[in-house]
Amino acid sequence: MTFIFNKSQLHDMQQIISLYKSFDKYNEYSREELYYHILPSVKLNQYKIIKENNKVVSFANWAYLDNNSEKEYKKTKDFSDKSWKSGDNPWVIDVVSKTNGAKMAYWLRSFFKKFKWMRSNNNFKFYRISKKGY
């Protein structure tokens, strides 16, 4: 079991989880499940948050996948925790925004020269996968 001991990251995690829980799409997930879902990216500092009035209103995380992990992710929509920083293929995993979604999109396009992503509906059915990256 892995935990975060950095107080700043722990505070971020609490606010990020609250952001997720503010969307019906994530109601079926416990706070613990969401914690473990975003833990690898936070531990590796592969995330960005935007705050308003000292509260997280937008969150994005990404993984650097190797070729095999990328193939697996495209096929299964999942990859192992050890794959989060296994290669040179940047994938944006989650973008969750109450406000400032456009600001987050601009930041991602500025931070990465190219990145890949998958888009899902509210039932987590993936309907669009980037082919060449942005």
List the predicted regions and their residue ranges.
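Short linear motifs at secondary-structure transitions and domain/linker junctions
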Residues: 21-27, 34-38, 65-74, 98-99
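A short helix-loop-beta-strand connector motif used in the catalytic cores of GNAT acetyltransferases and
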Residues: 36-52, 58, 63-69
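Generic structural motif
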Residues: 1-5, 60-62, 124
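Acyl-donor binding region in acyl/amide transferases
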Residues: 68-134
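Short amphipathic alpha-helical segment that frequently serves as the phosphate-/nucleotide-binding helix
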Residues: 31-35, 108-109
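Hydrophobic, Leu/Ile/Phe/Ala-enriched alpha-helical segments that form helix-helix packing faces
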Residues: 20, 38-42, 111-119
